[in-house]
Amino acid sequence: MTSLLFLVLISVCWAEPHPDNSSLEHERIIHIQEENGPRLLVVAEQAKIFSQRGGNVTLPCKFYHEHTSTAGSGTHKIRVKWTKLTSDYLKEVDVFVAMGHHRKSYGKYQGRVFLRESSENDASLIITNIMLEDYGRYKCEVIEGLEDDTAVVALNLEGVVFPYSPRLGRYNLNFHEAQQACLDQDSIIASFDQLYEAWRSGLDWCNAGWLSDGSVQYPITKPREPCGGKNTVPGVRNYGFWDKERSRYDVFCFTSNFNGRFYYLIHPTKLTYDEAVQACLKDGAQIAKVGQIFAAWKLLGYDRCDAGWLADGSVRYPISRPRKRCSPNEAAVRFVGFPDKKHKLYGVYCFRAYN
């Protein structure tokens, strides 16, 4: 019997970008794994990196060929692309791309991100002047010829999670309003991971709030009726995913270090809200935001037993050393409420940013 040998040829079209073409993001890559030769490997030496707002950080990423110490074959240009994964993992946001001498950064990362390039196989990304929104997971992708591989690095920020509801009261925010409410208070909407870490650190809160992935949850360390249910285990209770337009809950916000001074303004008299705003301005500052009082309390140990106005019209005071008449049972940012702004009953907390 005559044996027939069929040879199937697969043709791959490859177009090198024109040297003057800076639109690197539009280049179409066809990914095919070569059967022969060393395989391209991309490695992140650390899966998690910790930093804080205003700092600089390096997200590690290196690439190798399996069973060799070489960085590349030398026959193809190497393309490095960094993207940020959204909290629901449904999208990737472009951060930075490099190929040859071409470099391009995107959106709010422009002017703040660079490749470290400490060696020929170093694709690590440097992020400067870290913002709250930089928190999250980043993907490093390296492409050489027909090969590609990826690694994921998580950027975590030191900070504090706090529950927030507006003057209108409990359960009055849809998802988009919740996002804006956090931004207005010098913070961002918290992720599940951030809320989980806050719960592990003792956060106990009985009102459900939005998280960045669109879920609604709340942390319970001391289960009770009607907070998590009597005779149940502690944990982060999950209400699931709700309509982002019509469903209304509170929100959990996250903030980190600030570049400035938070302080209680010494003033001869108590102030109305409008007088409080003007008093801070006269002192070369602005009335402080809720995120700033939580950051000062949690990260700097700020302690003051005087209730003061904040920018959202609420009145609060931070206690890091519990004592008689000053939050005797626990360290906390105490919430007085949203009093009538014409009441001349409180002081004010101010914030002066450093240039």
Curated annotation (Swiss-Prot):
Keyword Plastid: no
Transmembrane segments: none
Domain Link stretches: 160-255, 260-352
Propeptide boundaries: 1-9
Subcellular location: Secreted, Extracellular space, Extracellular matrix
Residues spanning the signal sequence: none
Keyword line: Disulfide bond, Extracellular matrix, Glycoprotein, Hyaluronic acid, Immunoglobulin domain, Repeat, Secreted
Residue ranges of every copy of the Ig-like V-type domain listed in the record: 38-156
One BP term from GO: cell adhesion
Pfam families: V-set, Xlink
Disulfides per UniProt: C61-C140, C182-C253, C206-C227, C280-C350, C305-C326
Glycosylation site residues: N21, N56
CDD domains in the record: Ig_LP_like, Link_domain_HAPLN_module_1, Link_domain_HAPLN_module_2
A GO cellular component entry from the record: perineuronal net
Family indicated by similarity: Belongs to the HAPLN family.
Function noted in UniProt: Stabilizes the aggregates of proteoglycan monomers with hyaluronic acid in the extracellular cartilage matrix.
The protein, known as: Hyaluronan and proteoglycan link protein 1
Organism: Gallus gallus (Chicken)
Protein's gene: HAPLN1
